[in-house]
């Protein structure tokens, strides 16, 4: 069977020219040359989203125009007048199939044109690659796949009457009535047509990709024309060993490999470094309900260089004689006492303080005498402080005592209803600077109290007098130690003077106490070394305090930070 011979290319493929005689008898020759042929395109379809994913014909077609002038009898001597010729040129592109197809009897009309984009281009006079007029089509797309050609039709608009055709009628360009608009008298005349070589329109699956921009496109773009320049290769390679239509996007591989970065082993400077755990001995007990806050405060104490709170152990009775006034090292702790029948003895109003995590102090086997000056009762286990008073921002404990008349009968209710912590801080020794941390040894404060040394000057020194020694108060309740050890699991007793009343109503209640009733008049934290009796803070009395003031105006008894009880005139009554 004989094969069909290939179709002969049309005579106007790539190049075409035409000549005409002007009214002055000169011969003008128009020559079109398709300098950059279209090679490939991707079908964009005809749907609603076709314009969003449209690929232009690659490379963009570029057609060169040259105009020559010569004598009608001498075609050898031609003069290039492309830049000097005064006229407007337009090139209109259409699409046709490369292989003509016979039409059917009832061929339906196409619903939409196959060629889309901008099919019209004006002339651009450029100096490179040569001085000529150029028509550029950077935005041409084809909707359906197949093999096509582009037809370029040249139209001219003459501006001077001498350049019109020799047989054309003379038209008056003057307007007799300038005030009235006149119909346009300019006309576009068709000059010639040129076709491109066949190119293939691929489907989206088979499209090989866009190639690198050609040198002609770069030269044209450098002179200000709108041409898309692609400096990277976007051709997809097909595998040689496979026969199916597998497309390999090399550019995608390059882009993904460029995103891979070596991990920084030195760490990013902007990433916050996690703070190490605190080495303080005030670790959080698992049963403590405020463990998160306790960890935060213990870490803050380590961060500022403070020593964490040590578990308080009851020291041995001190020997007679003066003790060192400034002792910054805590006493060596004794073995802790075994837990009582209520190991979860905690205050529900401690508000983040960590004093309730320490075991209760152990009682001595015999009652204390006046010479030993035993530590009085505390609703919370006592512990020594080793922090800077200028940076203290945590809640302190209120400085109120408890009435002796109700102490023996209501001692068993202390483990059930946690009492508020005390707020009073121990007095500073005479030879200790105000900026240094307070000593954590109770013996140091004991010796200072025995010698009745004056306190260091504070902003409220005029309001708080020196405290007398309390040796006479230690023997008021000799039998309370044995009674309280059986009911409150080895808790020290109060050392109160006779006739002293308490500020707190410690009776059992059916509901929780309010914050105001628990913390008394000073319900704010202490900052910059302030004391609870400083006038900088307003005094706000609780209901129990106001009831006490109405009943008596006697001295009040309060507990010192080192465990001793002291009496003085209430500042609110002065």
From Swiss-Prot:
Gene3D superfamilies membership: Velvet domain (2.60.40.3960)
BP terms from Gene Ontology: positive regulation of penicillin metabolic process; sporulation resulting in formation of a cellular spore
Keyword Endoplasmic reticulum (UniProt): no
Keywords, comma-separated and alphabetical: Cytoplasm, Nucleus, Sporulation, Transcription, Transcription regulation
Bias kind Pro residues: ranges: 314-323, 330-341
Residues covered by region (PEST): 457-501
InterPro entries registered for this protein in UniProt: Velvet (IPR021740), Velvet_dom (IPR037525), Velvet_dom_sf (IPR038491)
Sequence ranges of Basic and acidic residues compositional bias: 513-525
Compartments in which it is found: Nucleus; Cytoplasm
Region of interest (Disordered), residue spans: 1-22, 39-60, 255-500, 513-540
Feature: compositional bias, Polar residues: 343-353, 385-394, 406-415, 448-458
Description of how the protein assembles with itself and partners: Component of the heterotrimeric velvet complex composed of laeA, veA and velB; VeA acting as a bridging protein between laeA and velB.
Domains (record comment): The C-terminal PEST domain is a region rich in proline, glutamic acid, serine and threonine residues that is required for the light-dependent regulation of development and secondary metabolism.
Role noted for this protein: Component of the velvet transcription factor complex that controls sexual/asexual developmental ratio in response to light, promoting sexual development in the darkness while stimulating asexual sporulation under illumination. The velvet complex hat acts as a global regulator for secondary metabolite gene expression. Controls the expression of the penicillin gene cluster.
Family: Belongs to the velvet family. VeA subfamily.
Descriptive protein name: Developmental and secondary metabolism regulator veA
Organism whose genome encodes this protein: Aspergillus oryzae (strain ATCC 42149 / RIB 40)
């Amino acid at each position: 069977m004989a094969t069909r011979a290939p179709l002969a290319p049309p005579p106007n493929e790539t190049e075409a020219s035409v000549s005409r005689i002007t009214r002055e008898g000169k011969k003008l020759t128009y020559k079109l040359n398709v300098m950059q042929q279209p090679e490939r395109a991707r079908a964009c379809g005809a749907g609603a989203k076709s314009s969003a994913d449209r690929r232009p014909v690659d490379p963009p077609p570029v057609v060169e125009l040259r105009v020559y002038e010569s004598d009608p009898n001498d075609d050898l001597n031609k003069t290039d007048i492309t830049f000097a010729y005064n006229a407007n040129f337009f090139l209109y592109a259409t699409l046709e199939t490369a292989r003509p197809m016979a039409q059917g009897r009832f061929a339906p009309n196409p619903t939409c044109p196959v060629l889309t984009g901008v099919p019209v281009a004006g002339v651009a006079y450029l100096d490179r690659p040569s001085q000529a007029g150029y028509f550029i089509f950077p935005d041409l797309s084809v909707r359906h796949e197949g093999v096509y050609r582009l037809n370029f039709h040249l139209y001219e608009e003459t501006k001077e009457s001498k350049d019109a055709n020799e047989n054309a009628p003379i038209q008056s360009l003057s307007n007799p009535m300038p005030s009235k608009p006149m119909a346009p008298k300019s006309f576009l005349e068709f000059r010639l047509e040129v076709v491109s070589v066949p190119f293939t329109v691929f489907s989206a699956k088979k499209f090989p990709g866009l190639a690198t921009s050609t040198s002609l496109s770069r030269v044209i773009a450098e002179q200000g024309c709108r041409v898309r320049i692609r400096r990277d290769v976007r051709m997809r390679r097909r595998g040689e060993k496979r026969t199916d239509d597998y497309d390999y996007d090399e550019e995608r591989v390059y882009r993904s490999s460029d995103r891979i970065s070596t991990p920084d082993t030195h760490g990013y400077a902007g990433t916050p470094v996690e703070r190490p755990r605190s080495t303080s001995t005030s670790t959080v007990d698992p049963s403590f309900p405020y463990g998160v806050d306790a960890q935060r405060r213990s870490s803050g104490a380590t961060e500022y260089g403070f020593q964490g709170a040590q578990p308080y152990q009851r020291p041995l009775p001190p020997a007679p004689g003066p003790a060192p006034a400034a002792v910054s090292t805590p006493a060596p702790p004794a073995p802790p006492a075994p837990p009582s029948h209520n190991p979860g003895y905690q205050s529900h109003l401690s508000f983040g303080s960590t004093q309730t995590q320490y075991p209760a102090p152990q009682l001595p086997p015999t009652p204390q005498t006046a010479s030993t000056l035993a530590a009085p009762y505390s609703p919370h286990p006592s512990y020594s402080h080793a922090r800077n008073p200028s940076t203290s921002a945590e809640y302190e404990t209120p400085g109120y005592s408890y009435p002796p008349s109700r102490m023996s009968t209501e001692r068993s209710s202390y483990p059930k209803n946690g009492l508020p912590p005390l707020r009073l801080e121990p007095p500073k020794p005479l030879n200790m600077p105000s900026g240094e941390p307070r000593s954590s040894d109770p013996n140091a404060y004991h010796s200072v109290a025995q010698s009745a040394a004056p306190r260091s000057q504070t902003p409220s020194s005029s309001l708080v007098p020196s405290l007398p020694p309390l040796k006479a108060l230690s023997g008021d309740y000799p039998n309370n130690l044995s009674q309280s050890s059986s009911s409150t699991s080895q808790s020290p007793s109060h050392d109160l003077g006779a006739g002293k009343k308490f500020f707190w109503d410690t009776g059992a209640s059916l509901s929780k106490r309010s914050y105001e009733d628990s913390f008394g008049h000073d319900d704010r934290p202490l900052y910059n070394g302030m004391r609870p009796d400083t006038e900088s803070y307003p005094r706000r009395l609780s209901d129990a305090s106001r009831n006490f003031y109405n009943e008596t105006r006697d001295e009040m008894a309060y507990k010192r930070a080192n465990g001793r009880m002291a009496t003085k005139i209430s500042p609110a009554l002065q």
